[in-house]
C-alpha cells in the first residue's frame, strides 16, 4: 500500500518538465531532457518497488535530471592525473607526446597538408616519405614503413613474407601482447603456418636448424618485452639466428615490441636492445611500437631490408592499416628529437620520466608535500616514502625504477575509500594503496598538476568522509 502511495506521489513527466531548472535545458535539447526525465522517474519507480520509503521532491528530481544532462554532455575521453608510477600505463593511453609532437599533430589536424602531395613535382606523393628518411637515418636500416600499430606491423610483415608458408618461432616467445591478443593468433590471421621449436624455457639454434625445410619462409624472434623467464633457461641469440638465416637463405624478422632508439644504460635502464643494434646484427626486418619506449604516438614501425619492406608497402593490407595524418605528424616531430639524444631525453616526456633521478624526484615530492599539507590541513596526514615505479606498457618487465611517493592517511575513512573517491573527481586521479596509505608516485605526475591534485584530494576527502568507503 505504501509503495503505491509513493508511486502516485511521483510527478508526471510533463509536470516535471515545467520545473524552472529544466525549462532552459528543454529549449536547448528537448529530446534529451525528455529522455532523461523518463529515465529518472523510471529509476525511482524501481527503487520504490525495491523498498525505498521516501522519494525526492520535484526540485530534487529536477536537479538529478540536470546533473545527468550535464554529465551526458561531457566528453567520455577525459584527462586524468596519473599518480600510479606506471610511466607507460596502457589503460591511460601510454606515451605522453612532447610539445613539438603535440603542436605538429594540431597543425596537421587544423590545416591542409602535403600529406600525399609532392610539392617539388606537383603530383601525388607518398605519405610515408615524411618519416622514412628519419627512420633510416636513426636505425641504419635500408628502408622503413609505418602503419597504425605494432600488431598491424607484425600482421603485415607475416602476410607479405610468409602467407601460405612456414614461420619458425621458439615456444618461449609465443607471447600474449595484451588485450588477449596472442602472437599465434596474429600469425594464424596472416596465413602463415606456425612451426614451434624448443621448449618454454630452453631453445637452441639446432632446434631452428632442424625445423628449416623447403617451405620455410621466415625465422621469427619475438622480444619478450612484457615478461622474463629466469633460472634454467637458454635463448637463441640474434647473432645465431641471423647466421642460420644467411646460411639457409631465409629472412630473419624480430618483433621488438617496445623499441628503444637510444641506449639508456647510463641511467640504469638495461635489458632492452635498441633497434639499431638489431639492424647492425643483420636482422632483415624489425618491428616496434611508436607509443611505448619511443615516446611518440600510436604507430607500428617496420624497418629493414629494402626489398622486403618494399614488398610490404605494396601489399593490399597496407592501405587498411595505414597511419593517419595527425599521428604521422606527431611521429615525425618525435623522431626529429632523436637526432640529438640529450635533447630527446629532456623533451620526450616518456624518456624524461624513465630517466628521472631519485634525488630529483625526492625534491619534487618535498615541494608537493608542502603544498598538500597546507591545502589539506586537518583532513589528512601527508608524508613521504621511497617507492618503486614501473615502465609499464609491456616494457622493461624486470626493471625497477627507484622513486618517491606522497603518502596520504585520511583522518576519517580509509585509503581504500579515498582511492575510489579520487576516480570520481575532476580531473580523476589514479593512485595506489599500500598498508592503508594512499600513495602518489611523483614520477608520473606532470608539471603543473600539483594544484589540480590538491583540489581533487580536498574534493575526494570530503566525499570519502561523507560517503564512506562504498
UniProtKB/Swiss-Prot annotation:
Top EC category: transferase
Family stated for the protein in its record: Belongs to the SelA family.
Organism of origin: Moorella thermoacetica
UniProt cofactor(s): pyridoxal 5'-phosphate
UniProt-recorded name of the protein: L-seryl-tRNA(Sec) selenium transferase
MF terms (GO), sorted A to Z: L-seryl-tRNA(Sec) selenium transferase activity
Location in the cell: Cytoplasm
Family annotation (InterPro entries): PyrdxlP-dep_Trfase, PyrdxlP-dep_Trfase_major, SelA-like, SelA_trans, SelA_trans_N_dom
Alphabetical list of Gene3D superfamilies matching this protein: 3.90.1150.180, Type I PLP-dependent aspartate aminotransferase-like (Major domain)
Amino acid at each position: 500500500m505504501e509503495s503505491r502511495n509513493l508511486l502516485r506521489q511521483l510527478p508526471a513527466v510533463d509536470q516535471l518538465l515545467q520545473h524552472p531548472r529544466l525549462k532552459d535545458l528543454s529549449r536547448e535539447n528537448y529530446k534529451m531532457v525528455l529522455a532523461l526525465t523518463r529515465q529518472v522517474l523510471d529509476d525511482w519507480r524501481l527503487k520504490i518497488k525495491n523498498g525505498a520509503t521516501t522519494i525526492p521532491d520535484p526540485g530534487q528530481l529536477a536537479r538529478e535530471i540536470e546533473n545527468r544532462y550535464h554529465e551526458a554532455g561531457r566528453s567520455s575521453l577525459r584527462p586524468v592525473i596519473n599518480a600510479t608510477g606506471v610511466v607507460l600505463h596502457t589503460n591511460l593511453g601510454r606515451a605522453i607526446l612532447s610539445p613539438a609532437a603535440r603542436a605538429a599533430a594540431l597543425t596537421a589536424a587544423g590545416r591542409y597538408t602535403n600529406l600525399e602531395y609532392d610539392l617539388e613535382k606537383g603530383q601525388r606523393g607518398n605519405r610515408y616519405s615524411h618519416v622514412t628518411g628519419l627512420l633510416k637515418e636513426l636505425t641504419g636500416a635500408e628502408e622503413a614503413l609505418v602503419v597504425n600499430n605494432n600488431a598491424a606491423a607484425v600482421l603485415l610483415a607475416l602476410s607479405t613474407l610468409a602467407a601460405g608458408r612456414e614461420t619458425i618461432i621458439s615456444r618461449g616467445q609465443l607471447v600474449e601482447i595484451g588485450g588477449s591478443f596472442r602472437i599465434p593468433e596474429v600469425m594464424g590471421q596472416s596465413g602463415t603456418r606456425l612451426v614451434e621449436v624448443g621448449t618454454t624455457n630452453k631453445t637452441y639454434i639446432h632446434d631452428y636448424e632442424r625445423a628449416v625445410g623447403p617451405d620455410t619462409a621466415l625465422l621469427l624472434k619475438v622480444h619478450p618485452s612484457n615478461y622474463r623467464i629466469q633460472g634454467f633457461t637458454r635463448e637463441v641469440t640474434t647473432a645465431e639466428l641471423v647466421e642460420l638465416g644467411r646460411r639457409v637463405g631465409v629472412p630473419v624478422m624480430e618483433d621488438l615490441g617496445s623499441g628503444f632508439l637510444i641506449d639508456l644504460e647510463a641511467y640504469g635502464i638495461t635489458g632492452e636492445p635498441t633497434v639499431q643494434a638489431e639492424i647492425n646484427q643483420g636482422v632483415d626486418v624489425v618491428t616496434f611500437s611508436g607509443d611505448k619506449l619511443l615516446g611518440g604516438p600510436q604507430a607500428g614501425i617496420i624497418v629493414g631490408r629494402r626489398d622486403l619492406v618494399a614488398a610490404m608497402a605494396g601489399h593490399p593490407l597496407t592501405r587498411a592499416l595505414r597511419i593517419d595524418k595527425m599521428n604521422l605528424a606527431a611521429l615525425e616531430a618525435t623522431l626529429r628529437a632523436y637526432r640529438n639524444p640529450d635533447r630527446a631525453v629532456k623533451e620526450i616526456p616518456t624518456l624524461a620520466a624513465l630517466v628521472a633521478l631519485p634525488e630529483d624526484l625526492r625534491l619534487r615530492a618535498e615541494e608537493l608535500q608542502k603544498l598538500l599539507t597546507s591545502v589539506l590541513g586537518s583532513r589528512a596526514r601527508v608524508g613521504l616514502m621511497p617507492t618503486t615505479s614501473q615502465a609499464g606498457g609491456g616494457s622493461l618487465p624486470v626493471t625497477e625504477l627507484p622513486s618517491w611517493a606522497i603518502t596520504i592517511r585520511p583522518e576519517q575513512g580509509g585509503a581504500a575509500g579515498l582511492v575510489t573517491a579520487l576516480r570520481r573527481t575532476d580531473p580523476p586521479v589514479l593512485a595506489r594503496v599500500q598498508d592503508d596509505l594512499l600513495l602518489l608516485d611523483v614520477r608520473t605526475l606532470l608539471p603543473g598538476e600539483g594544484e589540480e591534485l590538491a583540489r581533487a584530494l580536498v574534493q575526494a576527502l570530503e566525499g570519502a568522509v561523507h560517503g564512506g568507503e562504498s
